[in-house]
Curated annotation (Swiss-Prot):
One of its GO terms (cellular component) is extracellular region. It comes from the Eukaryota. Residues 1-30 have a biased composition (Gly residues). This is Glycine-rich cell wall structural protein. It comes from Elymus repens (Quackgrass).
């Protein structure tokens, strides 16, 4: 298998490819690392 695409979350890479015989490059990570929880700000 080949490399996967870019990760959906910032700072995280992608997974492996699912199609045999096809080599793919790994995707780049996102922007700054963000925590799962977010503080509630006044909108």
């Amino acid at each position: 298998g080949g490399g996967g695409g870019g990760g959906g979350y910032p700072g995280h890479g992608g997974g492996g490819g699912g199609y045999p015989g096809h080599g793919g490059g790994g995707g780049g990570g996102g922007g700054r690392h963000r925590h799962r929880h977010r503080h509630r700000h006044t909108a």
